[in-house]
Amino acid sequence: MEVPPPLVLKRPLYVPSKTLMGPGPSNCSHRVLEAMSNPVLGHMHPECLQIMDEVKEGIKYIFQTLNDATMCISGAGHSGMEAALCNLIEDGDVVLMGITGVWGHRAGDMARRYGAEVHYVEASFGRALSHEEITFAFEAHRPKVFFIAQGDSSTGIIQQNIRELGELCRKYDCFLIVDTVASLGGTEFLMDEWKVDVAYTGSQKSLGGPAGLTPISFSKRALTRIRKRKTKPKVYYFDILLIGQYWGCYGTPRIYHHTISSTLLYGLREALAHFCAVGLKAVVRRHQECSKRLQLGIEELGLEMFVSREEERLPTVNTIKVPFGVDWKKVAEYAMRKYSVEISGGLGPTVEHVFRIGLMGENATVERVDMVLSILNEAIQSSKLGIKTDLSKI
């Protein structure tokens, strides 16, 4: 039997233009998109290695770190989570997960697969974790590794006390992993000053790059622990000592580890170059100002933010309570069909409870804020009135 070529691949590729105002990815700039149209390079070509070096310096800047072990994992943000846990955890290690949404549970699932004894400290619904709650959990479990998401995109909660958690982890001889996938670029993060041992982020959110590369950095303290492991990390692909050699992190000759996408490197390089040109503080300030404008607009529309305390609201992924009697799916569908604008529903504990509006990268502008507020209001009013719109004709 011969399998014929699929008819769908005989048609030209068509990709519609959409404004991505959900929890990520965000829209790439023309600069980033144009960069990715450059010719492909071999993964060990000197020109590719040079671009990797430039990307590495950009990552150090956005994390505010001087760590040698700074690089990218080839994979989505989950690969950063896997790499952080895979390298730090050995069988029987006690690991504590901070829970403010879905990501602490996801990390716990991963850690258990690496042989860890996993415990959780969980915040009240719609709240960040207090220092007292975390300290109590440290006393109870004495963890070797503590994981926390600085910003949880499922709930729109920001954990503001990372600096204090760095001190707490040093006091208990514990290693601090911080997930900054949804927060970096939209809020302050000082890896070295706050004594964070491992940090990783996503390339496709506030950075405005393509998905598929995950910036990650390990402190000297974390690197020492990894080098003293009794066993090798359980996943070869995530072995940071090997990946770091490929990225030229340790002053040793570069080795082949895997075939990195030069195309994705070009895009991330230009996204980082934009951050450097504008300045990290200015980028953070723009994201925060846009979030405040959105929150004021939500209040004026008679809607309510999901996170009650303003200081605990994540600027990049804003969560709004779904009004009683409104079907969030119909609202999201209306926005997409009529305006090609993405407005997302909840994730994990917030499914059917919230809308999620992302203000990240190219979409963190006053114009985009005003646009999404107008569309959200129109879509909700349409839903409340029970207007049966034939969306296929919009």
Swiss-Prot record:
Q: Which residues bind substrate?
A: 153, 356
Please give the Gene Ontology molecular function terms for this protein. alanine-glyoxylate transaminase activity; L-serine-pyruvate transaminase activity
Where is the protein situated, by its record's location annotation?
Peroxisome
Q: Which GO terms are recorded in the biological process aspect for this UniProt protein? A: glycine biosynthetic process, by transamination of glyoxylate; glyoxylate catabolic process
Is Cell membrane found in the keyword set? no
Tell me the keywords, alphabetical order.
Answer: Aminotransferase, Peroxisome, Pyridoxal phosphate, Pyruvate, Transferase
Q: Which GO terms describe its cellular component?
A: peroxisome
Cross-referenced Gene3D superfamilies: Aspartate Aminotransferase, domain 1 (3.90.1150.10), Type I PLP-dependent aspartate aminotransferase-like (Major domain) (3.40.640.10)
Give the chief site where it resides: other
Binding partners and assembly: Homodimer.
Name of the featured protein? Alanine--glyoxylate aminotransferase
Q: Which organism is it from?
A: Drosophila melanogaster
Please name the taxonomic classification of the source. Answer: Eukaryota, Metazoa, Ecdysozoa, Arthropoda, Hexapoda
